[in-house]
Design a protein with these regions (language model features):
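Accessory N-terminal region flanking or inserted into the helicase ATPase core
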Residues: 12-98, 107-112, 135
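Conserved helicase motor core of SF1/SF2 NTP-dependent helicases
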Residues: 96, 103-191
Length: 191
């Protein structure tokens, strides 16, 4: 049995306010817990996959228990809001849904999207699997590249940079595994 008064320091900030979403990412265990929830996975499994462990499994589980105990007093975090949307929100029918930066959606966020698209006539999904930056929170570009059937359009010219940056980016890109093959051109300038 946890002594919640003693464990409270785990989820309170230095000025004694209840932790907010930003705080969960400052605490290693709560960040891993949030990643597990975003991946729709067992937190212990995600903990075991982590190569660097700042807390023991016992401390990890205690922090989760304490965090959830304090949230019972009508506190929710961002991940809770997404989970509630899946179960509690009836999304209205839409003519068009446009989703951008889709490479950074987590499995939990995709669950909401799957529910929304049931009532959508046309979906536009935009993103670049080479630009995924939220893997730390459970995002995986493979969901973006494989979920929606239909026509896929790859833009063949970037307007962001010229030849030198294009060449350098292609060297880096070759090191990205499971990336959709793209051949694109660049602006007529050096930078």
């Amino acid at each position: 049995m946890l002594d919640y008064a003693m464990e409270a320091k785990i989820i309170k900030t230095s000025d004694n306010r209840l932790a907010d979403d930003n705080f969960t990412y400052k605490d290693w265990s709560l960040g891993v817990y949030d990643k597990a929830r975003n991946m729709l996975e067992d937190p212990k499994l995600i903990y075991k996959r982590e190569t660097y462990k700042k807390d023991s499994l016992d401390v990890f589980l205690r922090k989760i228990s304490t965090y959830e105990h304090y949230k019972k007093d009508s506190f929710i975090d961002f991940t809770d809001m997404i989970m509630r949307a899946i179960d509690e929100v009836n999304f209205p029918p839409l003519e068009v849904l446009i989703l951008d930066e889709a490479q950074d959606f987590t499995p939990l966020q995709w669950s909401v999207i799957y529910k929304i698209v049931d009532n959508v006539k046309r979906v536009y999904l935009a993103g670049d699997d080479d630009q995924g930056i939220y893997k730390w929170n459970g995002a995986d570009p493979k969901y973006f590249t494989t979920y929606f059937p239909g026509r896929h359009v790859i833009l063949r010219k970037t307007r962001r940079f010229g030849e030198a940056i294009h060449h350098f980016s292609q060297i880096i890109r070759r090191g990205i595994f499971d990336s959709v093959e793209k051949d694109y051109d660049y602006q007529d300038k050096q930078g």
